[in-house]
Amino acid sequence: MARPSLPCAVVAVLLLALLPTPSTAGDPDLLQDICVADLTSAVKVNGFACKAAVTEDDFYFKGLAAAGNTNNTYGSVVTGANVEKLPGLNTLGVSMSRIDYAPGGLNPPHTHPRATEMVFVLQGTLDVGFITTANKLYTKTISAGDVFVFPRGLLHFQKNNGDTPAAVISAFNSQLPGTQSLAMTLFAASPEVPDGVLTKAFQVGTKEVEKIKSRLAPKKR
């Protein structure tokens, strides 16, 4: 199978980057042409300090070209192209990622606290959705060439219900959008969320909570 082309995804992220940015949304405005992230700097700022020696490679990343390995519990994998992988994104307020899904694969419910996400489907068919603060679910089945938007901070998911692999390119209006998985946040936090909080919140017993925690606990090597 020929590898899907990316032009439409590139157009999508460029359009997102060109949208007017209110002072309350996305990352802060840049104050110079470039500020390539110094990922080794001990200076703590809202973002990353600028490094002095800059090269073309600071603005280049080829990690989205190939499909990721979906051989895991959820049958999906996210390959990020954020400031940690592409230092030239520092202060520019955009990033991307590629998400690959095995047949039946799920990108489980999660949020991006610092960014709105827009996905462009490269191949396959996905059931996607997000939930508002009023507990209203908006869901849609999307296929190759389609675009869907997940508003900033809202819980959302993607599920491949097809019998062939699927893939999307995601665009974000943040250099580092952050990801908070609902299940991992509640049941695999360190230190642990007290059982009493979870049993009362989910109206289940301690045994059920401990069972979920054991399944989500990091695997020992």
From Swiss-Prot:
Keyword tags: Apoplast, Disulfide bond, Glycoprotein, Manganese, Metal-binding, Secreted, Signal
Annotated PROSITE patterns: GERMIN
One GO BP annotation of this record: plasmodesmata-mediated intercellular transport
GO molecular function: manganese ion binding
Gene Ontology annotations for the cellular component aspect, listed alphabetically: apoplast; plasmodesma
Cysteines engaged in disulfide bonds, as pairs: 35-50
Signal peptide span: 1-25
Domain called Cupin type-1: residue spans: 62-210
Glycosylation sites: 71
Localization in the cell: Secreted, Extracellular space, Apoplast
SMART domains listed in its UniProt record: Cupin_1
Binding-site list for Mn(2+): 110, 112, 117, 156
Domain of life according to the entry: Eukaryota
Transmembrane segments: none
Complex and partners: Oligomer (believed to be a pentamer but probably hexamer).
PANTHER family for this protein: GERMIN-LIKE PROTEIN SUBFAMILY 3 MEMBER 3
Record function comment: May play a role in plant defense. Probably has no oxalate oxidase activity even if the active site is conserved.
Family from the record: Belongs to the germin family.
Protein name per the record: Germin-like protein 5-1
